[in-house]
Structure formats: C-alpha cells, structure tokens
C-alpha cells in the first residue's frame, strides 16, 4: 500500500466501523503523519482516506467502552470501536500537534452527536448499568 506524502505509520489497529445504517464493518485503521486510512481486511483495499487537517475533534465517552467518533465537518464522520481507543486517540492528538501545531479537541462526554452520513445525524449515549455499559443511538 502506498501512502502518498506520508513518511511513517504512527498507529495501526483492527477496528469496527459503524455504517450510517448501523451495520458493523471490520476495518484496519492506519494513522500516518498526515492522514487516517481505513482498509478493508478482506480485499486489502483502501475504503477511505481522511487528511488529519480535516479532523475537527474526537469524541469518546467517559466510560470504559471501546467507542469513539472522529468528527470531520467537510465529510461524514467516523464512528468506530477499538480495544485500544485511549492509545489511538492519544497518538492522533500527538501526531496532529507535531504535524500542524494544532491541538486536536478531545470531547469526553457520555452523549454526543455525529454525522453518520451526509443526511443523517445520530446521537449516541452511554450509560453504566448493572449489566455493563449500555449504548443507545437516536436518529436526529
């Protein structure tokens, strides 16, 4: 795989990406000096490239779940799950600061909105219960 303009891979992990319709897709998340790449592990093809300069913020809950959202105002957002969520977000913050001297906003909240597609906004909320952490989605 050729990452044009990128000099090094800073982080890689297997993630679950949630589509606008709520389906889960396995993806390989690759973070380089300048972009996020999502790779389909079955076809080994790139499904999406997002320049880090386009990322406004990363949202994650205050609970010990695996969910996070990457907010991209010029496109639809990414809602994903990773067992290495905290590490992934920290590396994104560090890489963004190094590449552009910009402090990437990290929103810690048990409720936030994201654009699941060009025309669909979803609100996700996280709640701790006796059974574990409950995740709820609401179409806006």
Tell me the role of every PLM-derived stretch.
Residues 1-27, 31-140:
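Eukaryotic phosphoinositide-binding membrane-targeting regions
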């Amino acid at each position: 795989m050729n990452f044009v303009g990128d000099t090094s891979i800073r982080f890689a992990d297997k993630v679950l990406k949630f589509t606008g319709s709520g389906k889960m897709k396995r993806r390989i998340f690759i973070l380089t000096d300048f972009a996020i790449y999502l790779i389909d592990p079955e076809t080994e093809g790139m499904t999406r490239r997002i320049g880090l300069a386009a990322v406004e913020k990363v949202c994650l809950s205050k609970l010990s779940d695996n969910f996070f959202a990457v907010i991209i105002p010029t496109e639809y957002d990414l809602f994903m799950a990773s067992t290495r969520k905290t590490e992934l977000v920290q590396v994104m913050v560090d890489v963004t600061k190094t590449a552009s001297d910009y402090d990437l906003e990290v929103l810690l909240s048990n409720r936030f909105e994201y654009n699941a597609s060009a025309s669909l906004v979803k609100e996700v909320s996280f709640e701790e219960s006796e059974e574990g952490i409950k995740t709820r989605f609401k179409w806006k």
